[in-house]
Amino acid sequence: MTEFVVLIPARLDSSRLPGKALADIHGKPMVVRVAEQAAKSKAARVVVATDHPDIQTVCQAHGIEAVMTSNRHESGTTRLAEAAAALKLPPHLVVVNVQGDEPLIAPELIDRTAEVLVENNVQMATAAHELHDFDELMNPNAVKVVLDKNRNAIYFSRAPIPYPRDAMRAGKREMPSETAVLRHIGIYAYRAGFLQRYAEMSVSPLETIESLEQLRVLWHGYPIAVETAKEAPAAGVDTQEDLDRVRAVFQTV
């Protein structure tokens, strides 16, 4: 398998759950739990990229490498671009972006996302899973993605895509039957050199409208390969309820 590293963007500020990166999960801060899960993958190296010295301190106390970055980044991807430059990562090295609020992420998904990038010889790869719930289709917090025949992303949206026009006209709460509906999973793989290119790209109006950083890549004409996971991954932590759920999982381990 191609060598890759995991970079974990972790900022202290969070609008819905302040300080969540340091939230305790069964005796360890969440960012440490995420890094420990990532270390179970085949990654050659796991590094946390943070904007706060408290996060760097707790990571280092648990033997986890951490690098300081600016607190002015508006996306995790630009934060990782700064981290990759600071770490002097070779341009062709594969980097997997694991979100800092995913303490239950499957190591196998990390490995597979890196593999998809290499197999498809693209600049960026991500993942998705099939969605079967109508309420989730309509939920703007559930990001959907539609693919072309080559399994590359056509578009990501918070809106219901593909839109079941006939069913909606008839007032029916039905999922599209002609194709699978896919929910995006927030994990990315890219070459370290492409991270720098991303940071230099102009901001896409689409990414601003949808608040989805991956749309910058599509808008600038780069394909994004998408792996369809066999099952939905464990949800990340955005709210206190999510945190309570994850804590309960770790209490049973």
Curated annotation (Swiss-Prot):
It is found in: Cytoplasm. It is an enzyme of class 2 (transferase). GO terms for molecular function: 3-deoxy-manno-octulosonate cytidylyltransferase activity. Pfam families: CTP_transf_3. GO terms for biological process: CMP-keto-3-deoxy-D-manno-octulosonic acid biosynthetic process; lipopolysaccharide biosynthetic process. Belongs to the KdsB family. This is 3-deoxy-manno-octulosonate cytidylyltransferase. It comes from Neisseria meningitidis serogroup A / serotype 4A (strain DSM 15465 / Z2491). The lineage of its organism: Bacteria, Pseudomonadati, Pseudomonadota, Betaproteobacteria, Neisseriales.
